[in-house]
Amino acid sequence: MKRRFTLLIFVILLAAVSCSPASEVVPTTSTTAGAPLPTPRLKITEAPDAQTAAESFLSYWQAEDYENMYAMLARVSRDAIPFEQFVARYKEAAASLTLQELNSQVLSTLTNPASAQVAYRSIFDTSMFEQIQRDMIMNLVLEDNTWRILWEDGLILPELSGGNRLALDIKSPSRGSIKDINGTNLASQADAVAIGIIPSQVPNGQAGFLLSQAASLTGIDLRTVNNIFERDFNEWYIAIGEALLQSVQDLQGRYPSLINNAGLQFREYSSRYYPEGGIAPHAVGYTLSIPAEQLEEYQRLGYPNNAKIGASGLEKWGEEYLAGRRGSSLYVVDPKGQVVTRLAQNESKPSSNIYTTLDADLQAEVQRSIDGFKGSAVVIERDTGRILAMASSPSFDQNLLDPGNYNSIYRQGEIFNSPDLPLLNRATQSSYPVGSVFKIITMAAALESGLFSKDTVYNCGHEFTDLAGLTLYDWTYAKEVSPSGDLNLMEGLMRSCNPWFWHIGLELFRDGKTNYLAEMARAFGLGSSTGIDQVPEDGGSIQDVASEGDAVQLAIGQGTMLATPLQIANMVAAVGNGGTLYKPQLVERVEGLDGTDVFTFKPEVIRQLPISPENLEAIQTAMNMVVNNTRGTAYRSFLGMNYKIHAKTGSATTSAEDPHSWFAGYTDEGRQDLPDIAVAVVAENAGEGSEISAKIFRRILEVYYEGQPRTLYPWESSFYITSTPTPLPTNTATAGPPPTEEPTETPQP
C-alpha cells in the first residue's frame, strides 16, 4: 500500500511539470554554457587534543616552568589561586619530597565535547627516599577552543587533595671530623667555650696568670695572646680565642679561683670547633649557614633550613662524607596540622671522618715560621705527592666565622675587613712571578735542546748586551760585587747568573725553538692546575714566547709567567724523585660507616718530565751546589746543616720596591722513618730569596727532622720573638700579581 501511494505522488508531480509552458522557464543567473562553477570555500576547525595539552602541562612541571604551567589553568582555577601561591605549592612539595628528578607519562584519555579526563603517572626520584610513584587524574575543560587545566592540590600528589600539605621531619647525624694523618682533630663537633678578658675586672698582678691560662686553653701562642691584650687593652672586652668545654672544666678544677675571676670570661656554645685558633685553616676550610640563594637546593638534598654546610677547603670537598645521611620521615598533614599519614621514611647513617695527609705538629710550626709575612709555605712528600703542610699567611681563626661564638662579634672584622686578605689561600690561589727558581726549567730546556751541555762555559759579567738597544745587568752589579766570570752551566745555576740564562733564552729563540722553553715549563707542571681538587686552585700562566724580549724574561722567571707555591713545590719534587710529576693530594683516607675506608690515598702520576736521566742528574747536582758550594747563593743560609739539600733561590721583581722572596728545594736523605720532602716558600715583597725565604726553608727542615727550630732568624731575639720589627710588606696581595712586561735590568738571585 505504501509503495502504491509513493508511486501516485511521483506521477502527479511529473504531470504538473510537463503541463507548464516552456516560455515561462527563466534562468535565475546569466551563465555561459560550459563555464566552471566557483570553488566552494570550506573552513574546517580541528578539535583540540586533550592528551597533547596534558602532556605539555606535565612537561612544564618536569622543567619546573611554573609560569607556563599557570598559563594553562582554567579561568576558574586561576581565580582560585594566585600565581605566587601556585608556585609555592609546587616548591614546598618538591622540597619536602627532596625531589631530584620528576618523570610523568599519560596513561589514558577520555574526551567529551567540552571536558576531558587524562590519567597519568608521576615518578618522583628523591634524595632521601626510595622512588615514589603515583597515578592521578587531571580534569580539563575547553575554553575558547583550548583545553585548560582544572587545577587542585591533588595534581601534585593525590594525598594533597583538600588542602593537605607535606611535612618533612629530619634527624641529622653529627658532622664527621677532619683529622691529621695521625688522628689529631683539625675540625670536630664539640661543646666549646669562647674565652675573653675584661681588662677593668682583672685583679692587680693577675694579668700575666690569666693570659698564660688563656693561651694554654686555646692553644694560641702566649706571645700572640699578649699582643692581643696589649693592642685591645682599652676595649671593654678582649676576645682571646676558643677552647673545648672539657678543657676549661679541667682547668677550673685545678684553679677554682678562675671561676670567680670576673676578668676572665667564659661563654659556652656548641658548634664546629677548630683547635688552636685554626690549624691549616685554608686547607681544612670552615662551615657556614646555607646561603639564602642556595636554600632550595639544599632543602631538596634533605638539609634542614638551619643546617651548616662546608663552605671551603676539605669541609666543602668532603661534604657528602662529613654530613652523613640524614634520617627523615615524610608526612601528610591536614590544614589543621594533624598528621594524616606517613608517606615515606628512611634511617640516618653516621657520618664519615676524613683523615688528611697533613701532620698537625709540622703544620702548626710551618704556620708560625711564616707568621708576620704575607706569603706561603708548602711541604710535599717528595716521592708520593702527599701534602704534609700547607700554610698561607696571614692565617685566620675559623671559629670566628661561627655566629654562635661570642668572640665573633669582636674579631670577625679582622677576617673580612683586612686588606691582607687572610681568607685567600696563597699556596694555591695566588700566582706569582718566581724569579730565578725558574732557572731550573731553563737549564732543563738548554740541556734537552742540544744547544748546550752541562760543561758549556759562558762568561758571566755585569752586563748583557745581546738585545739590540738594551743593556741588562746581573744581580752582582747592584750588589757591587765582582762578576762571576767563566761558569759552566751547572755553575751558572749555582751562581744564579742572569746573563747566562738570558743567553739561553735568546739562543733558543734565535735557533727557531721559539716556544721550547714555554713548552718545557708546561711539562714541569706550570701554566695549568696541578689537579688537586680539594681546595680552589689558580693555574698560573705560561704564555707563548712572541719576541726576543719575552724569551730572555721567561728564562729568568719574569715577564708574564706566574706560578703558585704548590706548583713550585710539586715541580722541585719531580726533579728530586727522578722525574715523576705527581698529583698533590690532601686526603689520606676517608673512614667509612663500618670502620673500613671508602677512600684511600694512592699516588697519582701526572707525567714524567721530558728530560734524560743524565741531564736531570746535572740539574740535581747544580741545585746541591746552590746550598753546599761556597759560591752558592744559599751557602750561608745553610751553614752547619748537614742534611742533603738541593734547592734554588729566587727573587722575583714586581712593581713594588722589594721583590718576592722565593726558595724551593728538596731533601735526599733516603730515611725510612721520615720520607724526603720538597718545600716551596714565598714571602711577598720581602726581599731576596737567600735572605728571607731560605731562612724559613731551613727552619721547616729543622722542625721536620728534629722536631723543633734550632736556628734563629736574623730578625729574632728568641724563637718567634722579633728583635726588630717583623718584615711586613706594604702591598696588598692579589690572586694574580701584575706581571712585568719589559725585561728587568737588575733582577735578584
Residue ranges and their predicted role:
Residues 333-343, 383-436, 441-682, 689, ...:
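Beta-lactam-recognizing serine transpeptidase/beta-lactamase-like catalytic domain environment
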Residues 21-27, 105, 112-376, 396-422, ...:
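Extracytoplasmic/periplasmic proteins that interact with beta-lactams or build/remodel peptidoglycan
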